[in-house]
Amino acid sequence: MMQLYIANKNYSTWSMRPWLVLHAFNLPFQEILIPFSEEADGGAFKQQMLALHANGKVPLLQHDAVMIWDSLAICEYLAEQFQELPLWPKDPTQRAWARSICAEMHSSFMQLRSLCSMNLQPDYGRHGQRLWSEHAVLRAEVARIEQIWSNRAAVDGFLCGEFSIADAFFTPVVTRLQTFQLPVSDNTQRYMQKILQHPSVVAWITAAQLEQPVRRMEQYPR
């Protein structure tokens, strides 16, 4: 059975992405959660991860003797291992688009990621209002995200019709927009609700809300 090493569900966006793929497609895996430490240098968390792999980060997937790190690499590995399942869209054109937007998510939207860290417990709406008014780059990044989502196959569907790796990659963006209550269009809100109602997303968020806060990871006062 595969083993997926993750960190706190309340904070770890990169852990969330492959976990959602594994869970949504009912793939056999064992979740191993290594909680973040309060120490600035990572403390026990960093030590435990370095003992597993030189990368020292989550997520980490172990499949027999194979170790795969980085969320995108893990998802590509899963798509190769389970080719009978539509982890990527079957249509070549849709698959190319899905891969492109995942790669863009993987390498872009730095302001959103730095200013609006994932936290599934508090309501940061008042912080979101301030950040939105102060940061033009943040507004531009959200506009680009909305543009991507507006190209989905159907307004009431997932990005490529059915839930896929692409949706898993943008789920932490959905939660950020919700936690910080950033202003978005009705079209975007419909996609957000579609994601937030997915059973795997519900399962992750439910578990995240039961976790104890890690002070070091709390970006803003609650």
Where are these regions (language model features)?
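GST-like domain detector, emphasizing the conserved glutathione-binding G-site
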Residues: 1-130
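Short, contiguous strand/loop micro-motifs
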Residues: 4-6, 161, 178-179, 203-204
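Secondary-structure boundary/capping positions in well-ordered alpha/beta enzyme cores
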Residues: 56, 85, 155-156, 202
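Residue-level signal for well-ordered alpha-helical positions
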Residues: 81, 101, 180, 207-208
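GST-like fold's C-terminal all-alpha helical module
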Residues: 105-197
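Long hydrophobic alpha-helical segments typical of transmembrane helices together
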Residues: 187-222
